[in-house]
């Protein structure tokens, strides 16, 4: 199967289609689904990092996405050294409707953990600049927002002395490929001498080395079988991580829908990172909206005929990590619970408390489309739209669930 190629829509939420390699196949003999392996660390507490060249707006975008204030980012390379992280709310129409109906005292949306990392430069894989530290930061995250600069600004110098988005994309990809090649060569040298190392692991590592070094391709864009993928996941290779490309455009070009700056970038992504999402934005425009009240920002967007891209960016990152969420709802609290797509009911319940998994009995599940139609739990129950599900149930995006656990 392909590593990370299948595009799917997760739900009726505002989250857009994104890259996901989990596929479900249905057995002809039994009414069960078989979930294929996917590249990436499995889990519910995954994180995404903003990466790119220095001086392209990474730290400013991070502060806007996470609503944090770390001071004005400096206009010189490596202003960010140690990675910082914060959570961004994943707001969607389902969550908003539940809050509108219940008017709860406490509201907790789904959240995406985002890391701001130092700028990557040419020869970082050889240790230049912040080289090794930067690449270690990338290794610690599970997906990438790759920000590329497409705006000219004399007061913000470019480390390569000129603005060329396609060149920057190529530099970053080459550095990540070289670092993966270095890691794989070291792994094969060390583990190849050990009689305890599985032959399949060595064969997979050799093929991965041929992919990144011989073919110059990302691990995520090669084909891998279900035996190879867990091995690759254990290696935590940089080019196995899903990527969402963000293009920081000149504000005037962005507001006027100027496509010239995007053309070369889209062509490069189509050729080198097929299937990955490209989202244009203006960090300067987003920063100006960030300084306004929500009402003022809405008026500004309406007058310009252009909306903020923050929600789309956050949802794209959430989706790239293969995350979904379900809801628990009452007059006291409406909360979205983040889980990995494909999670079974006991695992989803265990996100609330470990006892919910250990003492799992069942879950009463209402599909969001039914709740949206009937507007209350009692109304859904009266028409048979509240179903009792057992431990084999796969939780779906937007499910409203009431768990039953043993005493």
Curated annotation (Swiss-Prot):
Organism whose genome encodes this protein: Schizosaccharomyces pombe (strain 972 / ATCC 24843) (Fission yeast)
Keywords for the protein's UniProt record, in alphabetical order: ATP-binding, GTP-binding, Nucleotide-binding
InterPro entries reported in the protein's UniProt record: ATPase_YchF/OLA1 (IPR004396), Beta-grasp_dom_sf (IPR012675), G_OBG (IPR031167), GTP-bd (IPR006073), P-loop_NTPase (IPR027417), TGS (IPR004095), TGS-like (IPR012676), TGS-like_dom_sf (IPR023192)
A GO CC term attached to the entry: cytoplasm
Family assignment from sequence similarity: Belongs to the TRAFAC class OBG-HflX-like GTPase superfamily. OBG GTPase family.
Protein name: Obg-like ATPase homolog
Binding positions (ATP): 55-60, 249
Function in brief: Hydrolyzes ATP, and can also hydrolyze GTP with lower efficiency. Has lower affinity for GTP.
CDD domains: TGS_YchF_OLA1 (cd04867), YchF (cd01900)
């Amino acid at each position: 199967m392909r590593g990370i190629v299948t595009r799917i829509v997760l739900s009726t939420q505002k989250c857009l289609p994104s890259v996901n390699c989990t596929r479900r196949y249905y057995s002809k003999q039994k009414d069960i689904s078989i979930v294929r392996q996917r590249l990436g660390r499995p889990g519910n507490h995954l994180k995404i990092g903003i990466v790119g060249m220095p001086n392209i707006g990474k730290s400013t975008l991070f502060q806007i996405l996470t609503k944090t204030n770390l001071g004005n980012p400096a206009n010189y390379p490596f202003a960010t050294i140690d990675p910082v992280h914060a959570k961004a709310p994943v707001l969607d129409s389902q969550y908003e409707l539940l809050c509108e109906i219940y008017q709860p005292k406490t509201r907790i949306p789904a959240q995406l953990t985002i890391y701001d990392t130092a700028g990557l430069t040419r020869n970082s894989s050889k240790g230049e600049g912040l080289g090794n530290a930067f690449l270690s930061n990338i290794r610690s995250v599970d997906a990438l927002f790759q920000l590329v600069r497409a705006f000219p600004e004399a007061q913000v110098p470019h480390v390569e002395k000129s603005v060329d988005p396609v060149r920057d994309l190529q530099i970053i990809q080459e550095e990540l490929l070289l670092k993966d090649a270095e890691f794989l060569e070291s792994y094969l040298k060390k583990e190849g001498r050990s009689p305890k190392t599985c032959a399949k692991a060595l064969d997979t590592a050799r093929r991965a080395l041929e992919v990144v070094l011989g073919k110059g391709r990302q691990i995520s864009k090669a084909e891998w079988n279900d035996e190879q993928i867990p091995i690759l996941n254990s290696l935590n290779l940089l080019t196995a991580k899903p990527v969402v490309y963000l293009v920081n455009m000149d504000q005037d070009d962005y507001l006027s829908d100027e496509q010239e700056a995007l053309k070369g970038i889209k062509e490069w992504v189509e050729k080198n990172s097929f299937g990955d999402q490209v989202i244009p934005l203006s960090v300067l425009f987003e920063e100006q909206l960030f300084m306004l009240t929500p009402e003022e920002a809405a008026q500004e967007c309406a007058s310009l005929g252009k909306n903020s891209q923050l929600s789309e960016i956050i949802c794209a990152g959430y989706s790239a990590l293969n995350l979904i969420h379900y809801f628990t709802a009452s007059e006291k609290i409406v909360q979205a619970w983040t889980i990995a797509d494909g999670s079974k009911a006991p695992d989803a319940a265990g996100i609330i408390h470990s006892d919910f998994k250990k003492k799992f009995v069942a879950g009463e599940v209402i599909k969001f489309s039914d709740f949206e139609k009937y507007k209350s739990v009692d109304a859904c129950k009266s028409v048979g739209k509240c179903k009792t599900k057992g431990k084999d149930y796969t939780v779906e995006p937007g499910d409203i669930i009431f768990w039953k656990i043993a005493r």
